[in-house]
Amino acid sequence: MAFETTFVMLKPGVLQRRLVGEVLSRFERKGLVLTALRLLCVDTATAELHYAEHREKPFYPSLIAYITSAPVVALAFKGENAISLVRTLCGSTRVEHAQPGTIRGDFALRTTTNIVHASDSPESAARELALYFSAQDFVEWRDGNYDFF
């Protein structure tokens, strides 16, 4: 098993609907270790860098508008197979395919505003973590309860 650090963004809808604690606890209950957290307003330039691979897709303008519309919570989690685990917890990006019990299945209302972003690969995680955090933002710590998860 790979010990990884991954990036998660709780999108504006999570804050607007007062779901931050509930969504955050889903990751914590699976034993992921929170190593960085920021509440921020994403500017257009950062949003465009983050979602550059979607630039030519029809939903790109609305995605950028959504991400920059209100604050987001940027998170870094560490754990065994963290990237895969986080994506499983989040569920399908398409709301109609998101299973009940997943974050999107339980809370997302529309695909275009699917409430959470999660890195899909080690390369994406590294790029996204660097986009939202600097080295001093990370707190390395050993969770004494880690072996119980």
Swiss-Prot record:
Primary subcellular site in the record, as a coarse category: cytoplasm
Pfam families xref list: NDK
Species the sequence originates in: Treponema pallidum (strain Nichols)
Molecular functions per Gene Ontology: ATP binding; metal ion binding; nucleoside diphosphate kinase activity
Active site: 117 (pros-phosphohistidine intermediate)
Catalytic activities: a 2'-deoxyribonucleoside 5'-diphosphate + ATP = a 2'-deoxyribonucleoside 5'-triphosphate + ADP; a ribonucleoside 5'-diphosphate + ATP = a ribonucleoside 5'-triphosphate + ADP
Protein name: Nucleoside diphosphate kinase
Keyword Cytoplasm tagged: yes
SUPFAM superfamilies given in the database record: Nucleoside diphosphate kinase, NDK
Source superkingdom: Bacteria
Function: Major role in the synthesis of nucleoside triphosphates other than ATP. The ATP gamma phosphate is transferred to the NDP beta phosphate via a ping-pong mechanism, using a phosphorylated active-site intermediate.
GO CC, one annotated term: cytoplasm
Family statement: Belongs to the NDK family.
Matching PROSITE patterns: NDPK, NDPK_LIKE
Protein's UniProt keywords contain Glycosyltransferase: no
Quaternary assembly: Homotetramer.
